[in-house]
Amino acid sequence: MATCIDTCRTGNTQDDDSRFCCIKNFFRPGFSVNRKIHHTQIEDDDDVWIKMLEEAKSDVKQEPILSNYYYASITSHRSLESALAHILSVKLSNLNLPSNTLFELFISVLEESPEIIESTKQDLIAVKERDPACISYVHCFLGFKGFLACQAHRIAHTLWKQNRKIVALLIQNRVSESFAVDIHPGAKIGKGILLDHATGVVIGETAVVGDNVSILHGVTLGGTGKQSGDRHPKIGDGVLIGAGSCILGNITIGEGAKIGSGSVVVKDVPARTTAVGNPARLIGGKENPRKHDKIPCLTMDQTSYLTEWSDYVI
């Protein structure tokens, strides 16, 4: 199924081969790398992947010491799927769970589930647009553990749905140990997700997170006790959840809502409103909550609500 980096599959055009070889030769380190590549064609419309290759070329020009690292992680791969399977397998492997075993598992899931890589691209774009600390797609791809944890969860969730629960839970455990992010493989997570900093994020089994949601570090989407069944929060599209917030129980956070940092939320939050405090209260009051026009997940504004909270004291 797999071929070495220098071997082209039957059906590749000469243009495909020459285009990739040009990129490969530029980045080739001073030693041979025996890697297996599953995808052998760079798609012309894959703007994110092409941009990553361009960024990698620029980075290596600035820092030649990174040539081998970038070659192994980015430029020796002919697809985003292969590069993602590689970086996750390296990050999540240990002495008894070698990276080549994880690579084969991850690449098989990614090849069979193209929707995962589409979500990966949207996540990369989300991080680049919303996090001022992110200087490039490659920077996010190689070093942002929130992004990597989210992609590992997407693979684990696919395995969970296939009733391969033991290996899905194993991935959850390795992500928790490696990234300090604990997302149950049963949780449903949309695309365009930003897990900023990500340390201490916990998402329970029956939680649902919509599209274009931004979640800061130390956030818990948890249950309220030991009851089973549908017991975790449902987060709408475009929501911003501030650092250190706890959202508990089978409640709904409406589309475009904002949860202030450090809040404890145990009741539904209407769409386009702001909840803050412990226990959380709606800005403007329960009867007439103030609604905002901007999309919180994009503005990443975590403090404007403080001036509208009448009893805020410093």
Swiss-Prot record:
CDD domains: LbH_SAT (cd03354)
Species name: Arabidopsis thaliana
Keyword Chloroplast: yes
Tissue expression pattern: Mostly expressed in leaves. Localized in cortex, trichomes and vascular tissues, particularly in phloem.
EC number annotated for this UniProt entry: 2.3.1.30
Subunit description: Homomultimer. Interacts with OASA1 and CYP20-3. Component of the cysteine synthase complex (CSC) composed of two OAS-TL dimers and one SAT hexamer.
A Pfam family the protein falls into: SATase_N
Substrates-to-products reaction catalysed: L-serine + acetyl-CoA = O-acetyl-L-serine + CoA
Domain of life of the organism encoding this protein: Eukaryota
Record protein name field: Serine acetyltransferase 1, chloroplastic
Induction: By cadmium (Cd). Not induced under sulfur-deficient conditions. Repressed in trichomes in response to NaCl treatment.
GO terms, biological process: cellular response to sulfate starvation; cysteine biosynthetic process from serine
Functional note: Serine acetyltransferase which catalyzes the formation of O-acetyl-L-serine from acetyl-CoA and L-serine. Also displays O-acetylserine (thio1)-lyase activity in vitro. May be involved in detoxification process by mediating the production of glutathione.
Entry similarity comment: Belongs to the transferase hexapeptide repeat family.
Pathway: Amino-acid biosynthesis; L-cysteine biosynthesis; L-cysteine from L-serine: step 1/2
